[in-house]
Amino acid sequence: MTRYYIRPIALADSPQAEEGRAVRLAGGLVYASRFALIAREGGKVVSRDLFDVATLEARLPDLPVEVHEHWANLQRVHTPLRLGERTVRLDQPQVLGILNVTPDSFSDGGEFMDRPEVALAHAAAMAEAGAAIIDIGGESTRPGAPGVWEGDEIARVVPVVERLAAMGVAISVDTRRAAVMEAARAAGAHLFNDVSALRHDPRSLELAARTGLPVVLMHAPGEGEDLHANAAYGDVVLDVFDWLAKRRDAALAAGIARDRIVLDPGIGFGKSLADNLALMNALPLFHALGQPLLVGASRKRLIGALANEAPADQRLGGSLALALKAMESGVQLLRVH
């Protein structure tokens, strides 16, 4: 079976580019005037043809229906996320500020755990600086991190969620466990950010559908406790694209509304430096999935690998560069420290 993909490759900041007409990607601030139409059979790319907008549109009647869907998805305008009393627009980049209340996160483990006033002050500072959402996590998902009992995770997360909800902050909870999702929602959380894409806990899909809260589905090759395991790709970009398409479809089949699904290619999760860079360079392709995109590359290992093994707290320059790369690719949500 032949699979097709449309990758925008000539980006501009207006409908008119030097190369001619450009189309608006995902209703945002980025336009594209050239597109690669990629054909794949048996896991291998068999053709890659370059088109301008007019030529590609003229070819559409002769191409399979999935190409029509991808073309429409690339231009799909996303409705804002409704997060409690807050509305987060998706026609411009938005920031998720990371708040880890863990003892062992790779970047800031222990800094905010058991220090509620310090955690709240940091969250307030991020919101004041412009973060649209505060993303609270009670479990480290770095390589080799031990699993956390859901009761401990709830004890870490819920008090902070309650306090931030009282402040009127839009809150995301970063968890793989349905019990934590339930407790966080009851405490005032507005969004579930699941690094397992609702695979880890058999109750998660049903819970997300029942609550109606938006969800972030992230790619990770592993299952169970080790999300970084089983990393084997034929073409990392297209493999991740196909995987996210399946998780999107599983969420839709479970009853999660389409305008409640955000997709994340999972930078740094079970991927080599080359894999991560390939994904960063191909981010515009993922708009063809028809969902808002989230990218979290802040302070991650790939930055250290490119910056003379700089430790996590000295990766600001690389974090900014990758955030800007995501922004110029039309990514709507940037998860940052």
Name what the model sees in each region.
Residues 1-84:
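N-terminal accessory interaction module
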Residues 75-113, 117-128:
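Glycine-rich adenosyl-nucleotide cofactor-binding module
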Residues 1-31, 90, 106-122, 141-170, ...:
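Active-site-adjacent loop and "lid" segments of alpha/beta metabolic enzymes
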Residues 128, 245-260:
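Phosphate/pyrophosphate-binding loops at sites that engage ATP/ADP/AMP, CoA/4′-phosphopantetheine
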Residues 99, 126, 130, 174, ...:
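Conserved, mostly hydrophobic/aromatic
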Residues 121-137, 329-330:
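Catalytic domains of carbohydrate-active enzymes, especially glycoside hydrolases
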Residues 136-139, 143, 264-267:
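Glycine-rich beta-strand-to-loop/alpha-helix junction loops that act as flexible
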